Amino acid sequence: MERRDFFRIAAAAGVGTAAQNPGMAQATAPATPPTIERATSGQPSKGKVFALITPHLDDGPIFAGGTIAKLLNEGYTGYFIRVSNDEKDSYNLTLGETVLANEQDAAQFVEVAGLKKRYDLHYRNHGLDDISRMEIRVRLIFLFRLLKVDTVLSYDPWGHYEENPDHYVTAQAVEAACWMSADHLDFPEQFDAGLKVHAVSEKYYFARGPQMVNRVVDIGPTLKQKIAYIRSCRTMITNMVRSTNDSLAAQGMRIPAFSGGQDAAKDAYIEAAFIERDKQVGAKYGLEYAEEFHYIGPDHSLDEYIRAHAERI
């Protein structure tokens, strides 16, 4: 996920609205107001498993970091599936150095967040549209069955105006894998390895562009955790800050907060580029900070019929 031009565009326009800031998703109003999901006390989700599946390290922390923290706080076991090798996202490193630096940062994110494990699929960054989607799908189905994933967080497979093929290829592979992992005729050879069919029952989809938002998560209680997650993406955030400074300098401008010590500059950038966005999203729903999703939950279509007609055998 790239944010290099965030302040170049905002500075050129002289404003900072959602329409002008890349990555600020535009909510398309659903037929009914979105559900507000708030923190729950205790650990009601103990025993449940989620997988964060994104092409790049920083996608999850930026777009769903508060929600990831909420799920973990409520008892979920979490896994991170990183689809690409993130070889394109650094400021002044070689390709090989970039792969290593982002791999180390990914390990740091997993540790900071308290996720159980990371799986890297190692496809080349910005090249997922040249990879068989079936291949990615099969690997995800294997992991969903192996880990018994209940909930996924990923890009919206139907998000509009997405310019990065890594994002929509990953999203569509995730959507298909969620469905097919529950089918006994999809890749049955996996059952000989001890796996069983497994249905993914919940999906939190985020987007950089317009999206049908039907779920809003209150991340006020988990904002500090989200900031820590984003900070762990050190190589990528450094790239964003320094590229923004270069772009501003080319226009004869500077932002003092981005020009200080490295850590202070990164914190200022995180606040301006990401946390301010979450604040704007929250304000729309009477919350301090929030994240928006298209949420697909469990299928309850037969619940009433089962309650009325099921009998013990």
Mark where each language-model region is:
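Active-site rim/loop-helix segments in enzyme catalytic domains that contact anionic ligands
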Residues: 3, 7-9, 29-147, 302-306, ...
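N-terminal export signals
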Residues: 5-27
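C-terminal accessory domains and tails appended to enzymatic cores
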Residues: 7, 33-37, 42-46, 183-196, ...
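Structural signal for conserved beta-strand scaffold positions within catalytic alpha/beta enzyme cores
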Residues: 52, 82, 120-122, 154, ...
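Histidine-centered active-site/metal-ligand motif
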Residues: 56, 164-167, 233
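Internal alpha/beta domain cores that form substrate/cofactor-binding pockets in large enzymes
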Residues: 79, 118-203
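Residues on a specific face of well-ordered alpha-helices
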Residues: 104-108, 171-172, 176, 224
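Flexible glycine/proline-enriched surface loops and loop-helix/loop-strand junctions
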Residues: 156-158, 208-213
